[in-house]
């Protein structure tokens, strides 16, 4: 029940569009929202708790004070909301993680001899900006490609023409030395124009222009210039070949999809210009727990395009976005031309979104692994597991188990081992299911556990089987856990610690406990368990595909998302065999027509 002051504030709210700010007892802004009608929107929070999500219930319980700002339209409210979220970073808002100062590329068109460099701020100074980029690594790579292609100056001298001797960058072919008159002003300006076209995704235009300039230089016997153009042409062709998408796309568009775990979402954006992938960026969103997919995409789009220097005419999203009409109106105003937002639910847009979503899932997994890479984090994770699960010691050795089959055929099981939080691949083991007929995962798990622990006391057990785990992790919920616990009891291992991790809600099940344990999404302990479970799944799936191939039912390439019959034939033709594909480097795979970097990554991981 709101306090008296809050009730009076709610009662006096106007029926205008605007922005509302919710504060806690300490005066901290904990949520910022916009509304077409302030009174109706704010009153919708103060309803019976059964009609609210747990996250909204938690927000409402902390509201102590309310402020609002009236705007002339809902579009003005959207812009004001964005600025307030960026300034205050309220806890309950969906917000970009570490969004302070994303890097941009700046072209100093206000200078006589323009430079291109990285900056974290934009100013109305006559420069041209491209971005934002998600991290400095990606923007540095782009800058390096530009430098190799166009050899613009990087020094910050205000009067470079006064220097008579070229610097080291000229000697190593990284600068055309305008400071010594090695290039005319018109030629240098032309070069910068090409760099801008390149950043806009118009590499085809740059390529045609360079071919013409090379031929003209050759015709006038200017072989040095012709050789420079030839090298630029070769470099651009290499870039274009790496931009081919597995999905057939045309025109200019951004494709946006995300993967979510609890309170954290990883958003992937593909930038497509003239049917080619000219770049992609990943962004972390915080505060997404219990948020609707359309709301997550809407909040990201607002925050991303608020600071983006390039807005395409079309944006394809994984799900229909909330506030689509007002977003389109706002983006169209920013672009100066019509912008359409559409959900990729079928056909070619769905094919494209599936690729983007797969990249988002991979980026989220890599972020989780990176977060667990430090010994301090791993120690924290193991200590948290000890406390949460009631173990006597931190689990030094964790074994993860999973089953893989299709309707009971070619069924296999996997065992992966993590010691002190790190995978020990030499101890991984796989099992071909021998006694179970049909699709009975529970019985298959029983067989795997019986065979694994039946070897503990055998002389030929080996180090992997001779040692008992501190903790067993089963991929599944109550049913799978009960089957395994029953098997362990029959083997006389009643005291063996075992848990199940159910994927849908990431809940941890313990024997003899009716309610699962729920850890925070950013918990090191949960992230470690997720990594063990995912590794067991990957190892089981890889063995299952191998068995299917040997039985003649399929190629090992089957089951890899995005690899259909035509791409499978092309890969076999290029590398000769599945073994040749397996041995090919990531770079070689990425160069095959129709195989983009995301698909090459999937092939390397699953083959």
Curated annotation (Swiss-Prot):
One GO BP? SOS response
Instruction: Report domain GIY-YIG positions.
Output: 15-94
Per UniProt, subcellular location reads as: Cytoplasm
Pinpoint the UVR domain residues. 204-239
Q: Which GO terms describe its cellular component?
A: cytoplasm; excinuclease repair complex
Q: Would I find Transferase among this entry's keywords?
A: no
Give UniProt keywords alphabetically: Cytoplasm, DNA damage, DNA excision, DNA repair, Excision nuclease, SOS response
Q: Which SUPFAM superfamilies match?
A: C-terminal UvrC-binding domain of UvrB, GIY-YIG endonuclease, RuvA domain 2-like
Which domain of life does the protein's organism represent?
Answer: Bacteria
- Gene Ontology molecular-function annotations: DNA binding; excinuclease ABC activity
The family note in this entry says: Belongs to the UvrC family.
Function recorded in the entry: The UvrABC repair system catalyzes the recognition and processing of DNA lesions. UvrC both incises the 5' and 3' sides of the lesion. The N-terminal half is responsible for the 3' incision and the C-terminal half is responsible for the 5' incision.
Q: Can you state the subunit structure given in the record?
A: Interacts with UvrB in an incision complex.
This chain's protein is named: UvrABC system protein C
Q: What species does this protein belong to?
A: Dehalococcoides mccartyi (strain CBDB1)
């Amino acid at each position: 029940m709101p306090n008296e002051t809050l009730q009076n504030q709610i009662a006096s709210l106007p029926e205008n569009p605007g922005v509302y700010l919710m504060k806690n007892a300490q005066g901290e802004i904990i949520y910022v929202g916009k509304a077409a009608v302030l009174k109706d929107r704010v009153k919708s929070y103060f309803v019976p708790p059964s009609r609210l999500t747990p996250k909204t219930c938690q927000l409402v319980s902390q509201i102590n004070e309310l402020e609002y700002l009236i705007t002339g339209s809902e579009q003005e409210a959207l812009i004001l909301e964005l600025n307030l979220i960026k300034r205050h970073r309220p806890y309950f808002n969906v917000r970009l993680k570490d969004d302070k100062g994303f890097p941009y590329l700046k072209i100093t068109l206000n200078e006589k001899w323009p430079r291109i460099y990285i900056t974290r701020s934009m100013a109305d100074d006559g420069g041209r900006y491209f971005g934002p980029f998600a991290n400095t690594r990606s923007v540095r790579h782009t800058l390096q490609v530009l430098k190799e292609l166009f050899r613009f100056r990087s020094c910050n001298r205000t009067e470079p023409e006064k220097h008579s001797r070229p610097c080291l960058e000229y000697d190593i072919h990284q600068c055309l030395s305008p400071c010594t008159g090695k290039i005319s002003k018109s030629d240098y300006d032309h070069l910068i124009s090409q760099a801008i076209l390149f950043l806009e995704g118009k590499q085809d235009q740059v390529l045609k222009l360079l071919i013409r300039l090379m031929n003209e230089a050759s015709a006038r016997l200017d072989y040095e210039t012709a050789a420079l153009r030839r090298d630029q042409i070769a470099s651009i062709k290499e870039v274009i070949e790496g931009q081919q998408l597995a999905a057939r796309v045309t025109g200019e568009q951004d494709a946006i999809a995300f993967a979510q775990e609890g309170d954290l979402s990883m958003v992937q954006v593909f930038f497509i210009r003239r049917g080619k992938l000219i770049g992609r960026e990943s962004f972390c969103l915080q505060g997404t727990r219990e948020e609707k997919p359309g709301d997550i995409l809407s909040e990201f789009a607002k925050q991303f395009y608020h600071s983006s220097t390039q807005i395409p005419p079309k944006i394809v999203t994984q799900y229909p976005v909330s506030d689509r009409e007002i977003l389109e109106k706002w983006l169209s105003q920013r672009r100066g031309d019509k912008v359409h937002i559409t959900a990729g639910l079928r056909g070619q847009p769905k094919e494209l979104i599936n690729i983007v979503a797969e990249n988002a899932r991979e980026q989220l997994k890599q972020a989780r692994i990176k977060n667990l890479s430090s010994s301090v984090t791993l120690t924290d994770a193991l200590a948290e597991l000890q406390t949460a699960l009631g173990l006597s010691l931190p689990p030094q050795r964790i074994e993860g188990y999973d089953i893989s089959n299709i309707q009971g055929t070619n069924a296999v099981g996997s065992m992966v081992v993590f010691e002190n939080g790190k995978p020990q691949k030499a101890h991984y083991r796989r099992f071909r299911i021998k006694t179970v007929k049909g699709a009975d995962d529970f019985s298959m798990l029983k067989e795997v556990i019986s065979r694994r622990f039946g070897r503990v006391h055998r002389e030929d057990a080996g180090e992997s089987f001779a040692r008992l785990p501190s903790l067993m992790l089963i991929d599944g919920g109550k049913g799978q856990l009960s089957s395994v616990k029953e098997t362990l009891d029959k083997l006389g291992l009643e005291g063996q610690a075992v848990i199940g991790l159910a994927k849908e809600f990431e809940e941890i099940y313990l024997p003899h406990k009716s309610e699962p344990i729920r850890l925070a999404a950013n918990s090191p302990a949960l992230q470690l368990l997720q990594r063990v479970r995912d590794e067991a799944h990957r190892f089981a799936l890889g063995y299952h595909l191998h068995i299917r191939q040997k039985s003649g039912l399929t190629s090992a390439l089957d089951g890899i998302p995005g690899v259909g019959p035509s791409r499978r034939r092309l890969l076999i033709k290029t590398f000769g065999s599945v073994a040749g594909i397996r041995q090919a480097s990531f770079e070689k795979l990425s160069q095959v027509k129709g195989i983009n970097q995301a698909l090459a990554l999937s092939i390397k991981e699953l083959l």
